[in-house]
Amino acid sequence: MRFDSVTFDLDGTMLDTVADLAEACRLMLEDVGAPPRSLAEIHSFVGKGMAVLVERCLTREHPPTAEQMHAAIESFKHHYTETNGRFAQIYPGVLEGLKAWKASGVKMGVVTNKPGMFTEALLERMGMSDYFDVIVSGDTTANKKPHPEPILHACEIFGVRPDRNLHIGD
């Protein structure tokens, strides 16, 4: 079957960004006076967006208050702006795959739960931004993945029927 477009998840699919996230979480937890988390814990918290990551890092016996969440999210944003892409690794075979898809003429996009302020900067820092025609971040649509809205939005921008799009993600 031939597809007219292909969309890719970012974290955990094309890039291993856990070390970036872990460093930002470490610094955020330090800022707010919370106990540290292990890399394995942070890895298990990733995938539902920044606010969920921060909340999971803060939650021990009781969930954080709204004030604690606000302070922690602001701290995380500050630190992640600095660590975003610093330790990230492109998974083996990803660049070769992107080159092949691009050469085939298929429209390509990124659909991620990562906030837009971090998505584009990360793609630039990793030298990957030129491969993509569309970027749908976690704050582009009202709903995040796994809701279909972000992928449907990418298809709409492409001008492609959803059944003609292939999504690759973890």
Regions found by a protein language model. Name each.
Residues 1-44:
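Active-site neighborhood of HAD-like aspartate-dependent phosphohydrolases
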Residues 2-4, 78-110, 116-120, 148, ...:
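Short, acidic loop-to-helix structural element flanking the phosphoryl-transfer center
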Residues 7, 14, 90, 108-111, ...:
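Conserved SAM-binding loop
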Residues 22, 26, 39, 43, ...:
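An amphipathic alpha-helix signature
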Residues 48-82, 92-95, 100:
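A metal-dependent, Asp-based hydrolase signature
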Residues 86-89, 115-168:
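Substrate-recognition "cap/lid" segment bordering the active-site pocket of phosphatases
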